[in-house]
Every structure is written in C-alpha cells, then in structure tokens.
C-alpha cells in the first residue's frame, strides 16, 4: 500500500507523535533545525509538537494546552502562535544558510512525565499486536526506546491492539518505515512501525484483534514491529498494560 497524502488532522497527529518517534524513538535522530520564540509567544515551526515545544520553553504540555485551548490529540499547525504563560523573552539556536547569528536560550527542558501519572493497569484492555520475541523493551532514558520492538519472521500478522480509528497510514516519518497509527479515544493512540504490507486505510474503523499489517523491516535493520502506546501524548510502557503473551486480557 502506497502512502497517501496527509489531511490536516492526520498531519497534526503525526506531528504530535513524532516527538517520541523522531527525537527519542528507535531511530535516535534529532531535528537540526529548531525555531525561535520571544516573550510569551511561540510560533509553531515545521516538525514541532506540543511536547517538543514544552521541552524547549519549559512550559508543561498541560499548561500549553490550557492556555491555547488545545484538546487531545493536541493538534498544532505550522505558523500557529502559542501562548507560553508569561515566559521570559528567549530564543534558541537555529541553523540557517543565512547570516550566522546564534542565540542560546537559558531554558530548562521539562522532565519526563513520571510513572505516577500513567493510567492505572486494567483501566483499558489491550491485546498483543503480534506474536514474537521482545528484543528491545521500553526505556525512560533520554533517547531511549519509547515502545517495544518485537521480532518474528517476515509476514507475521500484526493486529490492532484495541478498537479504534486509523488516523495515519504512510511512511513519511523517517526511521519508522511503513507506519500505522490508531486512535482509540481522546486519550490513547497506538503506533505500529516497520510494517511490510499495510492492510488498512486512513479513516478506517478497526476492531480489537483485526489484522492491519504484516511484519517487515522497512527502515529497520531487521524484521520487527516497533509498537507504542501513547496516553495523552506521552509514550507509556506497553509491557505494563499488555497481558502475558498468549493469554487474553483479564479486564
């Protein structure tokens, strides 16, 4: 399945999720071009997410959302101006081919969301997205894996971990190959990366356990599934919420 063009809603969700995928996910790459902000207003640049802006400005995601009337899944658009809650005038380094003028901000990135704020186990039922061996667990470290990587033979079926609506099918996010994202509620999104064949379309409703793809190695060193569960834009440890492999959830 070829990647389709993104609508605004899907693009916003991709921008949101890309902070985990592009800045701290399995590719480990970071954006080399960041924006600037002055006073208490930040202008959204290409590739920004609410979480990335939070880290840059020191304003929490919750506060940014409150000040700007943004609801989950926290969609933002290029050029949008965001209030920062009275932040002091600051600017951050920006690489450019124009004159070399570099300013450095004295802002402290916000810390990772503590586990105490994660949803309680059993609040929602999740199914394993595939069968296989977990070769890379979730990590809370900066630059660590914000999901789990599961290895199995090429073509192994991949299933929706829960019922929901497909909000992205494509390969525009570098380092994640053929990627599918499913929105399960206003709070939860799951992501399935490195697929071989993708069997769903944008906007399609899926059932829990429905086959959505086959395992592949697109943009990966080996055949694997990179799987994420995101709760209110924050990546949480899937192993904490999935039942033991081979068993049904008890919730």
Curated annotation (Swiss-Prot):
> Signal peptide location in the record?
1-25
Q: Where is the lipid attached (S-diacylglycerol cysteine)?
A: 26
Residue stretches of biased makeup (Low complexity): 93-112
Q: Where is the LysM domain?
A: 40-84
Q: Where is this region: Disordered?
A: 93-115
Query: What family classification does the UniProt entry report for this protein?
Result: Belongs to the peptidase M23B family.
The name on file for this protein is: Uncharacterized lipoprotein YgeR
């Amino acid at each position: 399945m070829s990647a389709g063009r993104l609508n605004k809603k899907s693009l916003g969700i991709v921008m949101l999720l890309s902070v985990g995928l592009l800045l701290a996910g399995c590719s480990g790459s970071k954006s080399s071009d960041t924006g600037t902000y002055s006073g208490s207003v930040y202008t959204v640049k290409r590739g920004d997410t609410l979480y990335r802006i939070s880290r840059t400005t020191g304003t929490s995601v919750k506060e940014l959302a409150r000040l700007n009337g943004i609801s989950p899944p926290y969609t933002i658009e290029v050029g949008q101006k965001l209030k920062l809650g009275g932040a002091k005038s600051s600017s951050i380094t920006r690489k450019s081919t124009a004159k070399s003028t570099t300013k450095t901000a004295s802002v402290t990135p916000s810390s990772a969301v503590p586990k105490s704020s994660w949803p309680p186990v059993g609040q929602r039922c999740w199914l394993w997205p595939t069968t296989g061996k977990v070769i890379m667990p979730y990590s809370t470290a900066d630059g660590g894996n914000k999901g789990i990587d599961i290895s199995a033979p090429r073509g192994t079926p991949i299933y929706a971990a829960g019922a929901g609506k497909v909000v992205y099918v494509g390969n525009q996010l570098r380092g994640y190959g053929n990627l599918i994202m499913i929105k399960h509620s206003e709070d939860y999104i799951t992501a399935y990366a490195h697929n071989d064949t993708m069997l769903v379309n944008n906007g399609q409703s899926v059932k829990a356990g429905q086959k959505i793809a086959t395992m592949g190695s697109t943009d990966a060193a080996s055949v694997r599934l990179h799987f994420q569960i995101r709760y209110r834009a924050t990546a949480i440890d899937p192993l904490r919420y999935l039942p033991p492999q081979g068993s049904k959830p008890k919730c």
